[in-house]
From Swiss-Prot:
Molecular function terms, GO-annotated: rRNA binding; structural constituent of ribosome
Function: Protein S19 forms a complex with S13 that binds strongly to the 16S ribosomal RNA.
One biological process term in Gene Ontology: translation
Protein name in the entry: Small ribosomal subunit protein uS19
One Pfam family it belongs to: Ribosomal_S19
Organism: Frankia alni (strain DSM 45986 / CECT 9034 / ACN14a)
Gene Ontology cellular component annotations, sorted alphabetically: cytoplasm; small ribosomal subunit
Family assignment from sequence similarity: Belongs to the universal ribosomal protein uS19 family.
Lipoprotein recorded as keyword: no
Length: 93
């Protein structure tokens, strides 16, 4: 169930402050965050936000199509290495 429109999008306060400071100064430094639950808002456009995936911070450049989505959607947490091919030669017996 999506969030109620009257509540507005959720963005962690510390992340919003960092974005506002950079917007007022006109700088575009990488912002490191652990807040995967924060919603991408139009104020973040053009910024690079390093989102934590549980192991490292993945840099995510915010574009117009990302507005309304969560930051965690752009930093995958699981790596799929593929299924191991069955070796028929070792199954003799």
């Amino acid at each position: 169930m999506p969030r109620s429109l009257k509540k507005g999008p959720f963005v962690d306060d510390h992340l919003l402050k960092k974005v506002d400071v950079q917007n007022s100064k006109g700088t575009k430094h990488v912002i490191k965050t652990w807040s995967r639950r924060s919603t991408v808002i139009p104020d973040m456009l053009g910024h690079t936000i390093a989102v934590h995936d549980g192991r490292k911070h993945v840099p995510v450049f915010i574009t117009e199509g990302m507005v309304g989505h969560k930051l965690g959607e752009f930093a995958p947490t699981r790596t799929f290495r593929g299924h191991v091919k069955e070796d028929r030669r070792s199954r003799r017996g």
